[in-house]
Design a protein with these regions (language model features):
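Short C-terminal tail/terminal secondary-structure segment
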Residues: 53, 136, 147-160
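Alpha-helical segment proximal to the catalytic Tyr-Lys
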Residues: 35-36, 77-81, 144
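Short, flexible catalytic-loop segment of classical short-chain dehydrogenase/reductase
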Residues: 86, 91-102
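Substrate-binding pocket helix/loop in short-chain dehydrogenase/reductase
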Residues: 6-7, 11-16, 116
């Protein structure tokens, strides 16, 4: 969940709503599901490239996703005795219905995406199936020695 909240226009209600969904909701969902996880399982958290790069109006959203990155690192230690791997995935610009929460539709959305594509080394936005394949990669038992990472699926955007 994310809405544009530039500094000076951040409301306490908007701030709380974003942290309630992206941070508090995540913590208590994972905690509630924890007894269901088998030893050697895998938890993959949904972070965002917004945690690693600045963008106007994305300060609060980016902060919530930085918290998600931190959870992956810390929870991988909390769950090491159960050999449960915890990783995060950070999608870049991926067209999803979530853009509606930003109030971006039609031409303004296309302009927003075009401005971001300029800084993506792969020269294009990503697709949802590319993120899904990255999640499957992390979830695989063949990746049993990967934990605590934040895998960027963003065409290299946050690396440059």
């Amino acid at each position: 969940m994310g809405t544009l909240q530039p500094l000076g226009a951040i409301t306490e209600e908007g701030f709380d709503a974003m942290f309630d969904v992206n941070v508090k909701g995540l913590v208590f969902t994972v905690q509630k599901a924890l007894p269901l996880f088998q030893e050697g399982g895998s938890i993959i958290l949904n972070a965002s490239s917004a945690a690693s790069m600045g963008a106007p109006g994305f300060g609060v959203y980016g902060a919530t996703k930085a918290a998600v990155r931190s959870f992956a690192r810390n929870w991988s230690l909390d769950l090491k005795d159960r050999r449960i791997r915890v990783n995060a995935i950070s999608p870049g610009v991926i067209p999803t219905p979530g853009y509606a929460s930003l109030g971006l539709f039609g031409e303004p959305l296309q302009q927003f995406i075009a401005a971001l594509v300029i800084n993506i080394p792969m020269g294009r936005i990503g697709e949802a199936d590319e993120v899904a394949r990255a999640v499957a990669f992390l979830a695989s038992d063949e990746r049993s020695h990967i934990t605590g990472i934040d895998l960027a699926v963003d065409g290299g955007m946050i690396q440059v």
